[in-house]
Amino acid sequence: MAKELKELTPRSVNYSQWYQDLVIKADLAENSAVRGCMVIKPYGYAIWEKMQRILDDMFKETGHVNAYFPLLIPKSFLSKEAEHVEGFAKECAVVTHYRLKTNHDGTGVVVDPAAKLEEELIIRPTSETIIWNTYRNWIQSYRDLPILCNQWANVMRWEMRTRLFLRTAEFLWQEGHTAHATREEAEIEAKKMQDVYANFAENYMAMPVIKGVKSESERFAGALDTYTIEAMMQDGKALQAGTSHFLGQNFGKAFDVTFIDKNGKSDYAWATSWGVSTRLIGALIMSHSDDNGLVLPPHLAPIQVVIVPIYRSAEQLTQISEKVAGIVAKLKALGISVKYDDADNKKPGWKFAEYELKGVPVRLAMGGRDLENNTIEVMRRDTLEKETITCDGIEEYVKNLLEEIQANIFKKAYDHREANIINVDTYEEFKEKIEDGVFIMAHWDGTPETEELIKNETKATIRCIPLAGDKTPGKCMVTGKPSACRVLFARAY
């Protein structure tokens, strides 16, 4: 039964199916009765809650406060920022009526045609418009600035091809929206939040990222600059893990958000927006997990340590439970989340397989012989290595082991990326190498036409213009025209 529990399609056979199998079998999420919308199950939601708590603390440490704005946005609001609405128009879900009525033949309910709204309402795909309409009421003077708001919410984008966590019609996210008195302040804010996201990705998700700026055609709709963090998944595809947008005065002008500056002159407010979503759970899975199941970094694992008793009698279980109670108390005192699984409806082998599948970083097992010898078996999920150690000082041992696992998971992902990022100088070589599932650094002439040609012919996109690294100019691999620096190309989720 334990083998059946873990039967996953191997990554080498079908990476996409492996991912789908794992999300379902590890009890993270499932499809719902609504097309493109998922049910996030308790274990998956526990990971999101940990992400939320950590990010929320990071936002508050950088001066942000939480607020909540309406789910429904008047259609006219979206019409005020042309670029913005064009970017989201095809994905918008529209509310046209406000009432149902019982069908005359008694077969159920129908939309009441008399309840048609005068103006349709859009279920938010993102909240810039409703928030900037509100900011107009909050801002009169430079003394009212900056406004640094974050919102935890759900949004809807009517995606046609959906995949659990990675791309769903409805998803959970946070969206920050800030207003500033100067361009410089807003640009600093946008870059700062990119740094916050990179810090979270690398130090909590154990996922190395490349920080960069999006090309003009890949920017957020209505942004002057989009700062991104890009991660490599195990199949070599890129995943955009977070974005921060410098919006200039576009929304200030669209919603007439003006203020009197220090010199007594009227000006439009400067804007940023930034967000990450439940997509990060998909990134977490694809960055670290293996053919045995999830591999979760300890900093985000809902259960960091599980303890399984192995016993032959009720009396022996009682003795093991008494011994384990002291270990549990010591681990919890160090802030470690621990579960003691003494349920009698599953055998130890089943439990081992289940917690391996669920990616619990450390598994402890205690049997009768361990009880006699004051020992305990320790298994680490990242390497599947086992050893038997003394119970004396077990809490410090486990604490250090969790940090070692966190560092090792990051190093493994970092080494994988570094081994699969290459420089390419010719378009022929580019077309050949992109099939290998790699990140490619290549010269581009800066035109959207060349970018589009590469995308159409190879399915690779410019993920970003990296902020760090080699800035040596060169010649575009396609046109031979001058190129300011190499940019990052990859196929992407």
From Swiss-Prot:
Belongs to the class-II aminoacyl-tRNA synthetase family. ProS type 3 subfamily. Keywords: Aminoacyl-tRNA synthetase, ATP-binding, Cytoplasm, Ligase, Nucleotide-binding, Protein biosynthesis. NCBIfam families: proS_fam_I. It is found in: Cytoplasm. SMART domains: ProRS-C_1. This is Proline--tRNA ligase. Its main location: cytoplasm. The keyword tRNA-binding does not apply. The keyword Nucleotide-binding applies. Homodimer. Pfam families: HGTP_anticodon, ProRS-C_1, tRNA-synt_2b. Catalyzes the attachment of proline to tRNA(Pro) in a two-step reaction: proline is first activated by ATP to form Pro-AMP and then transferred to the acceptor end of tRNA(Pro). It is an enzyme of class 6 (ligase). One of its GO terms (molecular function) is proline-tRNA ligase activity. GO terms for cellular component: aminoacyl-tRNA synthetase multienzyme complex; cytoplasm. It comes from Parabacteroides distasonis (strain ATCC 8503 / DSM 20701 / CIP 104284 / JCM 5825 / NCTC 11152).
